[in-house]
């Protein structure tokens, strides 16, 4: 084996170093001691990883072309690493509890392992490497979902997650086997050269799409989402809702546009149907929720529909819009989950929406920051979420002629998405109404968040405001994608 090939895998190599140092530091230090230095150490290692890999790199490959990377994949890996860093910073308060402090090292090692698997997925040019990366991300994620294993809800959520992940992986493997039977290869480039629309390849594409649809929580593959989000620790739920979803969505986009390009008409229609169902059904279910984590679960299903809307444009603009949307979604959604986690720690673990009644009077800063994040998720200007939705809508219709069948479908789906954006504003404003207008006989007491929570919220809030105002962010992503 030529170990110099690892030099072409700098993002993965640096993550392996971060994982190794984290393991050694955890192994060599006493878990009974006060380890205030451990979280800053891991976070600094992640910052170093981001700094090393933040600039777009030239296209490289390794392992006989099974692994390929370029500037577009590099940008997404940086965004995923940023989301992971925010989760690590935000997790400090939760991991300081007596029942979780002794598992702090395990948490960081699991979360870094999932990120490593996602990086492999993003850079895969072969279905074998893609599947290995997917499982490398899924197995540690199941452990994270069941991290509070002595809580019934967390153990149940972990069981549901692993069963669903197993089933979806089986469906995906079956689809890949059909594609191999039809094309005789598992390399993405080689499949794209020989694939054509036949019953076998169409079935393979549908099964593969269905398997990855489970990972992204697209309707009708979403049934596990609400229960797993509700039962998992809030910090893990935030990570699952943004980083995992972003990696899977980017990978699906790349495979559809690269491998299944000759079958464009088939997967585009399939995407139209799934997008409309995801956005509409998730919005209708979100309105009925009283538990905030279940509420955010259906919100994430709806956001997944918007993310995939960019793919139907089938252009470089699609990849740019999807990557930018994931970036904005990371900071906005993690801001919401950071606040939920902080309030949960000071409110006896309650995440019911009515417990937020009158939050503005007792904790005005948290109420204000929550409002900013919800406005961004809803697409209200001038926050970054509005621009991300605008670019997604532009990407969806940009290359389509309205006089063609696919073009008419594209414009129709964008119109439905616009209508659903208004519906989503209604249910996001339900939380704002609870915080600013509704009164409570037993309001949440005034409290001071931990410094780590304040830092995570500062990073997210700066992103929500700055990424919308600074147009160079989208320009930088576009240049990287087109490089």
Language model features with spans:
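Alpha-helical transmembrane segments of multi-pass membrane proteins predominantly involved
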Residues: 1-483
